[in-house]
Amino acid sequence: QGVMDKLDYLQDLGVEVVYFNPLFVSPSNHKYDIQDYDYIDPHYGKIVDDGGEVLPNGVTDNSQATKYKKRTTGLKNLEASNELFIKLVEELHRRGMKVILDGVFNHCGSFNKWMDRERIYEGEEDYEPGAYISADSPYRSYFRFFKEGPENWPYNANYDGWWGHDTLPKLNYEDSVKLENYILYIGRKWVSPPYNVDGWRLDVAADLGRSNEYNHEFWQKFRRAVKDANPNALILAEHYGDPSDWLKGDEWDTVMNYDAFMEPVTWFLTGMEKHSDEAREELLGNIDNFIGSMAHHMSNMLTPSLQVAMNELSNHDHSRFLTRTNHMVGRVEHLGPEAANEYVNKAVMREAVVMQMTWVGAPTVYYGDEAGVCGFTDPDNRRTYPWGHEDQELIAFHKEAIRIHKEHPALKTGSLKILS
C-alpha cells in the first residue's frame, strides 16, 4: 500500500519500471530467505486476521511466536496480500509502468514450509511436515542431508546451506524433479494472470544447482516456462564476472551490470571499491583503465543484452554511491552511520548520474539515491527513504537527466564511440 501511495512521485520522477527486492513471505528485513514462494508477505501486504503473542524476552524458540505464525501461515492474510499485490500491478500497468520481482531460487530460508527448521508449520492442519521435522516429509528430497539415517529425525539439522549458512538451506534440484517442476511453476505463476508481473531478477543465479551443466539446463527450462507464459517477460540475473555463457538467447536476457558499468564508473569517479572496502588512488580519474575495462566487459554481451543491462550506481548489496564520494574506507560497524554522510561530493554524484543516463544500458536508480540518501554497505545502505527531508536539488537533477534519457532514442539504442 505504501508503494501505491507514492506512485505519483515515482511517475513524476520518470520511473518506468519498479524492481522489488523479495516480496514473498520471509522472517527477515531483506527477505532473501523465502518462507513461502506462493504468497506476498502479509507484513508488506495485508493483515486481516491477527492475534497471538510475540516471543517473550530471552526466548529464542520461534515455534512459540504465535503472532508471527498467525500472520504468515493463515490463508486469510496470505490471500489478502496477494489480492493487494494484484491491485498494485494493475495500477502500475495503468500508468504505463512495469514490475520486476526478485526470484531467490538457489536457496530458501530455514523458516520455509518445505524445511520448517523453526517449527512454524509443525502440526498445522493445512501443511505437510517439513523435511527438518520428519524423514517422511514430502519435501525431504528438496534438500541435501548429510546424515540420512532415520535416527537423525525428528529435527535433522544436518543439511546443506548456501555458503554454509543454516538459515539459507540450498535447494537440491538434481535429486528432486518435483522441486524443479514447482520452481518452474512459480516462475510461470507470477508472470501470468492475475499477477501479470513483467519479469524476474534472479538472485545468485550462477550458483543454482551443484554443477555448471545442471545450472544451464535449469535456466533453459526456466526461460521456456516464463516466456511461454509471458513472451515479453524480462529475465535478468545477478552475476559477477563474464555472463556470456548464459546470454546466448536460451537462458537469461541480461544481467545486473556490475562489470561493464557499476565497477568501472565507481573506480573512475571515486577511486573506491563498490563496498567502500578499498581505495585505489591510481584508478581515480584513470581514463585508460576506465575505457579499457568498459570496452572489455561490454564485449561479453551481445547488443540486445547490453541495451537492457541494469546500470546501477548503488543497490542493496553495496555502499551508496554518494557515500563512496567521501573516500572513507570501512563499514558502518567500524565507522558509525554518521560517517557515511560526511564529506560527500554531490558534484561527483551528478557526474555519475549523467553517465548513468547516457551510457548504453537501462539506468536503474536505487531508491533514495535521487534524494541524497547515504550509507555504507549492507545493512547501512538500506536506510528508510527520507520523506520530508529529501535533497530537492538532487531530485530535480535526476528528474531532468531521466527526461533527457527518455526523450532521445539514441541514448537507449544508439551505438557507443569513444573519442580519444
List each model region and its residues.
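Substrate-binding/active-site clefts of carbohydrate-active enzymes
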Residues: 1-16, 23-194, 222, 228, ...
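Conserved, mostly hydrophobic/aromatic
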Residues: 10, 20, 37, 92, ...
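Loop/turn elements at helix/coil->beta-strand transitions in domains of secreted/extracellular proteins
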Residues: 11-18, 93-100, 195-200, 230-234, ...
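Short, flexible loop/turn elements at secondary-structure junctions
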Residues: 24, 41-44, 105, 175, ...
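Conserved alpha/beta catalytic core and glycan-binding cleft of carbohydrate-active enzymes
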Residues: 111, 219, 223-224, 232-379, ...
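Conserved N-terminal glycine/acidic-rich loop preference
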Residues: 168, 186-193, 197-226, 242-263
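Short, contiguous acidic/charged loop-to-helix segments that flank catalytic cores in large enzymes
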Residues: 209-210, 338-344, 385-392
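Glycan-recognition and catalytic regions of carbohydrate-active enzymes
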Residues: 290-296, 365-367, 371-420
